[in-house]
Amino acid sequence: MKHGNTVGSLTEIQHARIIGSLLGDGYMSCKTHAYLKICHSIHQKEYVDWKYHILSSFVLTKPKAYKGNGKRVGYRFCTRSMEVFTQYYKDFYVDRKKRVPETLVLTPFSLAIWFMDDGVKNRKSLYLNTQQFSLRDQENLLHMLKRDFGFEGNLNKDKKYLRIRLLQESAQRMKSLIQPLIPTFMRYKLPL
């Protein structure tokens, strides 16, 4: 997945932020051109603001709180619908269903974003909640983690769905790799 340096193109940090968000909680929609929606709990307001800061040149409205189902309150922003996002949509969606592009290359920063969105530490393991993806996509993600970082892991059943579990030694190496990239307000995801 390569996105060129044309007018309106993204920096490497913006690109990594989008990749990590799409592997996590980010969502895209497309009519003529695609847009990215970033949405988290109001308790992660600082995290949404942090993501917004990097993508603000593509956003018209600052993040806002909204009321979800029941008592849930979220905090979100959307980028503008732009051609620069359309290739991401084509890469990550088939028939409006999110998938993992086989050409995806992970970077430490995209991995850090993905972990902040959908990662959890439990005992000596790190988990990536990949339940939204098909079995094939999850296997591809395991392959990418091994190819790009040398991390060993497996698919672990969480209730009735599978998710990625990094083995202890790989979990330690991943923690060392991404911890410097994680802002202090998200460090609770990676306790010492």
List where the protein language model places each region.
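Internal intein/HINT superfamily modules and their associated LAGLIDADG
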Residues: 1-192
